[in-house]
């Protein structure tokens, strides 16, 4: 497989692109709907993301390689990245890209959270706590002059702060905090800068059934996907990742203690500490 991939990547991008488009057409008929309008399941255990901007797609490609290199966090393997010129009707004239990855088993947690018991949530939260700890150990080797940046040391794309508009990079947390409400709050200083997924929420966490040692069935994390916003951020911001709408951390943790659990807050309580 590795030898074939090396040979395949030597072929012209136009030929590879044509093949991916044919697989995309076949996959749409075979699997109907993907996780989003931009992400599609293909035959042969593959997924294809297309239509996203080249910069964010390249960032995801590099993030996946980085996570696979430094951690045991289950993420897709990035196989190919092809950059393309802007669509003719794109008013922003932004380059876009095709990203080919392997497929991970499982279903987004957001689609099956009602099937998980309290015991299942405890297990999933424990896994996520371990994975987040591993991600925070990934070394930053890019752009030493800018502490807060994407995987390549360039602009960040953070839907929590600026929609999908690129911002930064930033030399320190004080400069980064100017994007937020109350930017001069002393609480927005002194946090460790760590590697972060950037958009971690139940839609991007895959879970699947498994058999426990005692013979009972439960749920476990089988993958984390959608890494296009990954980068190096203040650690405190990672607490918001479990809710892309940016509910304050103290409020989220308080809500996690109520009987009427919501999936996001249950995970945040167990995994974000």
Functional labels for PLM-detected ranges:
Residues 1-36:
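Juxta-kinase regulatory segment immediately upstream of eukaryotic protein kinase catalytic domains
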Residues 194-195, 208-273:
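Active-site Asp-x-Gly
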Residues 57-61, 125-128, 132, 202, ...:
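A structural signal for well-ordered alpha-helical scaffolds and beta->alpha junctions
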Residues 83-89, 121-128, 134-199, 208-219:
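An alpha-helical support segment within catalytic cores of ATP-dependent transferases
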Residues 60, 197-199, 204, 226:
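Acidic active-site catalytic centers that drive phospho-/nucleotidyl reactions
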Residues 28-151, 155-158:
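ATP-binding pocket architecture of kinase catalytic cores
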Residues 63-65, 203-209:
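Short, well-ordered amphipathic alpha-helices
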Residues 106, 203, 230:
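Active-site loop signature of alpha/beta-hydrolase-fold enzymes
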């Amino acid at each position: 497989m590795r030898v074939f991939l090396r040979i395949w990547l030597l072929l012209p991008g136009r030929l590879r692109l044509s093949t991916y488009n044919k697989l995309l057409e076949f996959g749409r008929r075979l699997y109907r709907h993907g996780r989003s309008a931009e992400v599609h399941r293909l035959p042969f255990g593959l997924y294809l993301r297309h239509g996203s901007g080249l910069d964010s797609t390249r960032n995801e490609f590099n993030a996946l390689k980085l996570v696979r290199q430094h951690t045991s966090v289950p993420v897709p393997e990035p196989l190919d990245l092809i950059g393309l010129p802007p669509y003719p009707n794109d008013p922003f004239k932004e380059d876009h890209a095709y990203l080919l990855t392997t497929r991970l088993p499982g279903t987004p947690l957001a689609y099956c959270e009602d099937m998980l018991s309290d015991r299942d949530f405890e297990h999933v939260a424990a896994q996520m706590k371990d994975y987040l700890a591993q991600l925070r150990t990934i070394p930053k080797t890019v752009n030493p002059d800018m502490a807060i940046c994407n995987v390549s040391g360039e602009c960040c794309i953070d839907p929590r702060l600026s929609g999908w508009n690129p911002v930064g990079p930033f030399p320190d947390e004080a400069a980064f905090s100017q994007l937020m409400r109350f930017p001069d709050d002393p609480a927005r200083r002194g946090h460790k800068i760590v590697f972060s997924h950037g958009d971690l929420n139940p839609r991007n966490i895959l879970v699947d059934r498994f058999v426990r040692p005692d013979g009972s069935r439960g749920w476990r994390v089988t993958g984390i996907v959608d890494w296009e916003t990954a980068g190096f951020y203040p650690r405190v911001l990672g607490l918001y990742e479990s809710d892309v709408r940016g509910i304050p951390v103290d409020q989220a943790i308080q809500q996690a203690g109520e009987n009427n659990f919501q999936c996001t807050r249950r995970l945040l309580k167990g995994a974000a500490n």
